UniProtKB/Swiss-Prot annotation:
GO terms for molecular function: RNA binding. The lineage of its organism: Eukaryota, Viridiplantae, Streptophyta, Embryophyta, Tracheophyta. Its main location: plastid. This is Maturase K. Usually encoded in the trnK tRNA gene intron. Probably assists in splicing its own and other chloroplast group II introns. Keywords: Chloroplast, mRNA processing, Plastid, RNA-binding, tRNA processing. The keyword rRNA processing does not apply. The gene is matK.
């Protein structure tokens, strides 16, 4: 810890929460530039208490600084950037580098607070919690006992100045915040950042780390209203993953628990609920309760007022929905979630009489959104909007094995992700679309008919579309048809899925 602080020269500046001098340190931009080029995250290690090798880091910095000075900055132009040259330099490049460096600098105080907070405390270190599927066992265990659900879309900030204003409560360095405000206003195409769709696309493509920092900070401020519930409910579970800042903010919110409890003391009577669960992924969150819709209406009213008063955001009606889990399906992480009644009948035999007892239990159900998947395949030009398979002319120049392998990999990824559904029969339609699209692409390449290619390839084409479970079934029963692979119809949650792959992305 002390070596890391001395290396970053924070001993003197940390006393007054000044991070402004670090912006002028050259190695900060070398770290930021190297992290972007290598696609790695410097501060996000497997364990926070694991000391990195400073010798390796110093060698990396020296190499990156030398490489940066030797590179020609005019090669960094992009098509949609209009380079503004000042004294022969690309100013857009330096805007981007300062954004990347600022993201590194601002994370340093948060990182040091997290490390100091975790000193002497045991934490569960599990990479499995980063998997998207790790949240579904929790939903399966808890949501079957709940009735009402508040479906929330976290609103985007109407202006980035609001983010700067909220950031000043954490980073108490006016000079750094003024510099951030200056570059946000001077950044090219500033007006395009005001549109929510362009906001995420623009930053995620240009300055991914900086976008994550600003957006996660906005979400962290929004989630601060749930801190006071930790003392009121032992069932409140907060699952955060993937982003370094989210974990810092979660531990920091635990420290501020007493403060928020005092501030919200007058509202505890209205929101006290022993069966209240909160789950979020990116900009979508759920607040589920066992009580009737009265509590959900109170939460909806409170959230709308909180957004308007604290973030100056007018909440649109479509941002918050109150759903009954037994009557509605909710779209979350590529699944349709619902709670349905599962009827069961028990025969009771007494001495002389026997009678039937009808019983119904609640069951958490996960369905495959087949309409949404067909829409994705339609955008990727594998089929039309009705689900009729189409050829892929762009891939006609590839070899036959590459074409078959690409189609098979797309289906295996989709089947792998939706293995948690009990009704996997919906995936057979996706397999049909991709198989026929593959056959039509091959027929188009060789200027032949689809029937002749299916007859020529036979099982060779089918094997590429087998999942792991179907391969085991096929090897065990080689004479069985591939479409009858119903060896196991239960849910399978994989703990190695960290993102949802776009069907159009084939890399």
């Amino acid at each position: 810890m002390e070596e890391f602080k001395r290396y970053l020269e924070l001993d003197r500046s940390q006393q007054h929460d000044f991070i402004y001098p670090l912006i002028f340190q050259e190695y900060i931009y070398a770290l930021a530039r190297g992290r972007v080029l290598n696609g790695s995250i410097f501060f996000e290690n497997a364990g926070y208490d694991n000391k990195s090798s400073l010798l390796i880091v110093k060698r990396l910095i020296t190499h990156l600084i030398t490489q940066m000075y030797q590179q020609n900055h005019f090669l960094f132009y992009t098509n949609d950037f209009n380079p503004n040259k000042f004294l022969g330099c690309n100013t857009n490049l330096y805007y981007q580098m300062i954004f990347e460096g600022f993201a590194v600098v601002v994370e340093i105080p948060f990182y040091l607070r997290l490390v100091s907070f975790l000193e002497g405390k045991e934490r569960v270190k599990s990479h499995n919690l980063r998997s998207l599927h790790s949240i579904f066992p929790f939903l399966e265990d808890k949501f079957s006992h709940l009735n009402s659900l508040l479906d929330i879309l976290i609103p985007h900030p109407v202006h980035l100045e609001i983010l700067v204003q909220t950031l000043r409560y954490w980073v108490k360095d006016p000079s750094s915040l003024h510099l951030l405000r200056f570059f946000l206003h001077e950044y090219p195409n500033w007006n395009s950042l005001m549109t929510p769709k362009k906001f995420s696309f623009y930053f995620s493509k240009r300055n991914q780390r900086f976008f994550f920092f600003l957006y996660n900070f906005h979400v962290c401020e929004y989630e601060s209203i749930f801190v006071f519930l930790r003392n009121q409910s032992s069932h409140l579970c907060s699952i955060s993953s993937e982003i370094f800042l989210e974990r810092i903010s979660f531990y920091k919110k635990i420290e501020l628990e007493e403060v928020f409890t005092k501030n919200f003391k007058a509202f505890l009577w209205a929101f006290k609920d022993p069966f209240l669960h909160y789950v979020r992924y990116r900009g979508k969150s759920f607040l589920a309760s066992k009580d009737x819709x009265l509590l959900m209406n109170k939460w909806k009213y409170y959230l709308v007022n909180f957004w308007e008063c604290y973030f100056s955001i007018w909440s649109q009606p479509r941002r918050i929905h109150i759903n009954q889990l037994s009557n509605n399906c909710v779209d979350f992480l590529g699944y349709l979630l619902s709670v349905r009644l599962k009827p069961s009948m028990v025969r009771s035999q007494m001495i002389e009489n026997s009678f039937l007892i009808e019983n119904a239990s609640k069951q958490f159900d996960t369905l495959v959104p087949i309409t949404l998947l067909i829409r994705y395949l339609s955008k990727a030009k594998f089929c039309n909007v009705l689900g009729h398979p189409m050829s892929k002319p762009v891939w006609a120049a590839l070899s036959d094995s590459d074409i078959i392998e690409r189609f098979g990999r797309i289906y295996r990824n989709l089947s792998h992700y939706h293995s948690g559904s009990l009704k996997k029969i919906s995936l057979y339609r996706i397999k049909y679309i991709l198989r026929l699209s593959c056959a039509r692409t091959l027929a188009r390449k060789h200027k032949s008919t689809v029937r002749s290619f299916l007859k020529r390839l036979g099982m060779g084409l089918l094997e590429e579309f087998f999942t792991e479970e179907e391969q085991v079934f096929y090897l065990t029963f080689p004479k069985a048809s591939s479409t009858s692979g119903k060896l196991y119809q239960g849910r399978i949650w994989y703990l190695d899925i960290f993102c949802i792959n776009d069907p159009a992305n084939h890399e």
